[in-house]
Amino acid sequence: GADEARDRRWGLVREAQRRAAQSIKRLVVVPSTDLACTDGIHNSSGSNVILGERMANVALKELYGQSGLSSPNLRRVVRKGARKLFLEFGEGHDMRPAEGPDDGMNVEDAQGLIRCSACNYCPGGLEAEFERDFELPARFHAYWRCEPPAFLARDISGMPMLSCYGVEIEE
């Protein structure tokens, strides 16, 4: 895997992209975290085809108001116990977790990073459980590393959730 400083820089870039789509009118972001690269940063030709299809579907809905898709974007992260979080997504996103432990999701508190041990479907989002108890203030990261895991949480259409980094966990 990549070194931690490089991963954190990737996380900051991915979070800036996600937030830009929330604050800049008519700007949309589509996920590419699950797509193959030909080197460290360039999408493969096959990935570009998938990316183009995603962009077209998102543009139909977000820019033209027609039937299409939108990128699953995390709305809120709410603590649901000593080790659990509720990950809330926008309307129209019936989310499906990655199988088994989700290596791409972490909580970070004063003691450091905590790995996700299980992620399950629940109405309106996902419920994630972590390997140890965590204390607030804490932050949530998903698919933020330079080299993300092979399996990511997706909505029912197959669109992966947007990466996020440093999202505040609410009580």
What label would you give each PLM region?
Residues 1-171:
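Cell-envelope and extracellular/periplasmic
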